[in-house]
Amino acid sequence: MITPPPLVILGFGYTGRWLYRLAHEQSGRILASSRQPERHLTEVPPTDRIRFDVTDPTSWPTLPREADLIWTFPAIPLDQVQEFAKQHCHAHRRLVVLGSTSAYDRHEQPTMDLPPWIDETSPINADLPRVQGEEYLRAHHGAIILRVAGIYGPHRNPVDWIRRGRVGPTNKFVNLIHVEDLARLCLQALRQGQAGTSYNISDGQPRRWVEICHEVSARWGVVSPRQTLAEEAGKRIRNHKALTQLQYTLRHPDFYQALRSIEGLPA
C-alpha cells in the first residue's frame, strides 16, 4: 500500500479542527498550521505544528515540500497569494481551497421571490478580493475550489442563532452544510477532485428562514426576538456536482435531525 503524502491544514478554525480530527482516519502524517501555533494549536502534538502566515514569506518554507494542502481561510491578499503560490504550489502538490457561496453575490441581480438555482456554471463576482485569490489559484495552480454554504454543527447551532435573534423569520433563502460533511468533502476532494475545478458544498436543501423558524418553534418552542424585515431573496445552491463527482453521501441529510442531535433536543 502506498503511503499518502503528508497533509497540511492551513488554518485551524472551526472547520480546520474538524478536518484535523477526521483526517486521522486515513494513513499519512497530518499537520496543522496557525500564525500563532503555540496559542492556537495546543491540541496538536508539537511535532505536527507549523507556523504559517500567508502575509509573512519567512513562514512559507516551513511547509513540507511533498505535502498536500487544504487551505481553510480566505485567499487574500492577492499579491501575497500569488507570490506564495509561485514559490510553493508546484505541479505535484494537491491543493484544496475553501471559498464561499458569497462568490455568487452580484449586486445587479433583481430581487425575486424564488431565485434561480445556482450551480458551478453560474457567474461569480470577480470584484471580490477572496474570489480573485481563489480564481488565481484555480486557473494557474490547479487548485480545487470548494464554494461553501453556511456552516453549522456542534457549538455553531442555528437554534441558538434563532434564540439569540441573530436571524428571524424572513423569506430569505439560506443554504447550509454540516461541518462534518464539509470536512469529509474536503478530504474527498483532495483524493478525487479534478484539479482546476470548483464544487458547491451545501446540503442541497435551501430553506427560507421563516420556514426554519416555524419548524424550530413548533418542535422546541424556540422563537426569535428579531423583527421580520424586508431582505434580499438569498440564493438556492445546487450540490449535484460535488456529490456525484466526489462520490459522497451526506452524513447529515436531515437538517432538523442534525439540530436535535447537536443540542440533545427532544424529537
Residue spans of the language-model regions?
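N-terminal Rossmann-fold NAD(P) dinucleotide-binding loop
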Residues: 16-17
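NAD(P)H-binding glycine-rich loop region in Rossmannoid oxidoreductase-like domains
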Residues: 46-87
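Conserved Rossmann-fold NAD(P)-dependent oxidoreductase catalytic core, especially the SDR/UDP-sugar
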Residues: 85-125
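Active-site Tyr-X1-5-Lys
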Residues: 121-145
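Glycine/proline-rich active-site loop of Rossmann-fold NAD(P)-dependent oxidoreductases
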Residues: 128-131, 140, 151-164, 180, ...
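Substrate-positioning beta->alpha
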Residues: 145, 167-190
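Mid/C-terminal beta-alpha module of Rossmann-like enzyme folds, strongest
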Residues: 183-188, 192-239
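C-terminal amphipathic/interface module of NAD(P)-dependent oxidoreductases
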Residues: 230-267
